[in-house]
């Protein structure tokens, strides 16, 4: 079939071309009139035209040559007023408008880090074309990355998978990989899909980045970093540069991470992830004033970005917690939670941080239990319509930490019953953690260690998962050497947060002291006393004890 002007214009818009040339030949009394027009692809406005006449069929070819020459001249004049557009995304949809919205969504998330805008644009695209598989896939990914509405995210990724047979090979592999990763929790099959994408194009930046994520989840950070860097070399996006940054932080390569952060600020100044990375580096380096400076800078730079406002405050709350300023941490966390509530995020009503600071830092088990029970009465999980959006597993961890194994298991069982189609792999790590905490509270310390080692096997990409609990089990079993080794492993492993740092300082000091290792005891007493120098009054008795023992050791050692 002949290529019509309207179809040619749509193809040009998809490919980022400025204009198309439309032409026709009309017979008039034995002669022929040849007309060519240069038309803007974006809006159909005629930019230039020319006409030539051929007296008979023998003159048609020479007339075409003359017409071509004149049009070339006029194209040169007209194109100075045209702007060049980037090609639209090469994905399957019947709607040019939906494709434009999808392409805008990619720009929002890849170069501005604006997931909220991307989600809105993708929703608009899907209203226009409900069978737009790539938009469904991307919507699911962004909802997951933003930790929003797991039920919607799962539905979106599943819908993309259901539409995969109408897609190009590249799109089909992307839809399959997302489904295997986010719905089936089958990383091996996701890896295969991304590798097939690389068979199609070894420089596919999306495949390289996403395969890096899989390797990172499997604990192979070096391989992940290599893939991210190959992806950035093809096409720099804030997502992949952010993945490089966070991987370097997890690897403890803070100077290189800082270089990635500086590049992120330069290339993507509105992307919140680089502020987060800079705060994580400062926290790892124990630069607590730096965390405050960066969080304040983030709030000032991104005043209308509600996720940025919430995230900055959660970091400030953790920073206050680390220094024993629990009342300040609670107040800041309440501010952060209000942003979550404004965004409509499930779980924004629950005082997660207050529970853990009450139980772990204040060591007030009764008040922690009272708080937990009050949360569930004031905000019943059943009030959250979608079972998959209910934070049941967060409550499982709380009940487990309190030693209520029955309630912890009940949370897992209720969640599994509410979402029966979820693969067993989704629950394996939570079950291992629940079994481990139950064993600790039952005094079965070796069983607890086995369960938390299983957790580490199930979560190889988590730097520190299970470290504290394994150390605690050894500690309660009276195995000081093993407890010290695991507490130090927990303390010294690079991470993206460090809520236990003061507790580790305090307990390591006590363990070394008990072994007669006064040099290391003094070191950790000093670090603890310094960190909690301005702690709340309710914590100062512990600081006083540690300071007194530190001074005693110094006197003993001369």
Q: Which sequence ranges carry the predicted segments?
A:
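Short coil/turn linking the two alpha-helices of tandem helical-hairpin repeats
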Residues: 106-113, 140-149, 180-185, 219, ...
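Canonical tetratricopeptide repeat
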Residues: 138, 210, 243-244, 277, ...
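Start-of-helix register in tetratricopeptide repeats
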Residues: 99-100, 134, 171-172, 206, ...
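TPR/TPR-like alpha-solenoid repeats
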Residues: 142, 179, 214, 247, ...
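Acidic, proline/glycine-rich low-complexity intrinsically disordered segments
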Residues: 1-274, 278-281, 285-296, 304, ...
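Solenoid-like repeat scaffolds
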Residues: 161-166, 195-200, 232-235, 262-270, ...
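TPR/TPR-like (Sel1-like) alpha-helical repeat modules
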Residues: 144, 149-150, 154-165, 488, ...
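Register position in tetratricopeptide repeats
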Residues: 110-111, 145-146, 182-183, 217, ...
């Amino acid at each position: 079939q002949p290529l019509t002007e309207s179809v040619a214009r749509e193809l040009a818009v998809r490919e980022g071309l400025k204009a198309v040339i439309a032409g026709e030949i009309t017979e008039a009394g034995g002669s022929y009139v040849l007309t060519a027009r240069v038309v803007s692809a974006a809006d159909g406005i005629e930019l230039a035209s020319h006409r030539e006449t051929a007296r008979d069929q023998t003159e048609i070819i020479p007339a075409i040559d003359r017409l071509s020459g004149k049009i070339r001249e006029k194209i040169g004049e007209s194109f100075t007023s045209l702007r060049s557009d980037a090609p639209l995304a090469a994905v399957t949809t019947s709607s040019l408008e939906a494709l434009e919205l999808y392409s805008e969504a990619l720009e929002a998330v890849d170069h501005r880090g604006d997931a909220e805008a991307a989600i809105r644009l993708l929703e608009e695209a899907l209203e226009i074309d409900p069978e737009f598989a790539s938009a469904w896939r991307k919507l699911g990914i962004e909802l997951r990355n933003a930790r929003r509405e797991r039920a919607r995210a799962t539905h979106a990724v599943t819908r993309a998978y259901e539409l995969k047979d109408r897609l190009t090979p590249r799109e089909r592999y992307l839809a399959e990989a997302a489904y295997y990763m986010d719905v089936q929790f089958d990383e091996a099959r996701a890896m295969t899909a991304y590798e097939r994408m690389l068979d199609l194009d070894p420089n596919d930046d999306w495949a390289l980045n996403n395969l890096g994520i899989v390797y990172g989840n499997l604990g192979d950070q070096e391989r992940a970093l290599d893939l991210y860097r190959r992806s950035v070399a093809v096409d720099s996006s804030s997502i992949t540069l952010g993945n490089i940054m966070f991987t370097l932080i997890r690897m403890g390569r803070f100077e290189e991470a800082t270089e990635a952060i500086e590049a992120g600020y330069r290339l993507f100044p509105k992307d919140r992830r680089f502020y987060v990375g800079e705060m994580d580096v400062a926290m790892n380096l124990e630069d607590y004033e730096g965390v405050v400076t960066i969080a304040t800078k983030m709030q000032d730079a991104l005043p209308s970005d509600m996720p940025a406002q919430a995230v900055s405050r959660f970091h400030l709350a953790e920073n206050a917690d680390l220094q024993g300023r629990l009342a300040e941490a609670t107040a800041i966390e309440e501010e952060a939670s209000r942003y979550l509530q404004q965004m409509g995020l499930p779980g924004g009503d629950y005082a997660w941080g207050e529970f853990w600071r009450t139980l772990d830092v204040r060591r007030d088990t009764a008040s922690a239990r009272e708080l937990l029970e009050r949360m569930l009465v004031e905000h019943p999980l059943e009030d959250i319509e979608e079972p998959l959006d209910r934070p049941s597993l967060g409550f499982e961890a709380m009940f487990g930490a309190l030693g209520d194994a029955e309630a912890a298991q009940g949370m897992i069982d209720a969640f599994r019953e509410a979402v029966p189609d979820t693969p067993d792999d989704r629950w394996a790590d939570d079950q291992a953690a629940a079994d481990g905490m139950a064993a600790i509270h039952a005094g079965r310390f070796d069983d607890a260690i086995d369960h938390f080692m299983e957790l580490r096997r199930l979560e190889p990409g988590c730097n520190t998962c299970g470290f504290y609990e394994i150390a605690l089990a050894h500690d309660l079993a009276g195995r000081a050497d093993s407890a010290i080794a695991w507490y130090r492993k927990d303390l010294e492993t690079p991470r993206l947060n460090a809520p236990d740092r003061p507790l580790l300082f305090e307990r390591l000091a006590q363990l070394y002291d008990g072994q007669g290792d006064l040099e290391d005891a003094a070191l950790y007493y000093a670090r603890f006393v310094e960190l909690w120098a301005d702690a709340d009054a309710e914590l100062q008795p512990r600081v006083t004890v540690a300071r007194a023992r530190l001074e005693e050791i110094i006197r003993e050692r001369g």
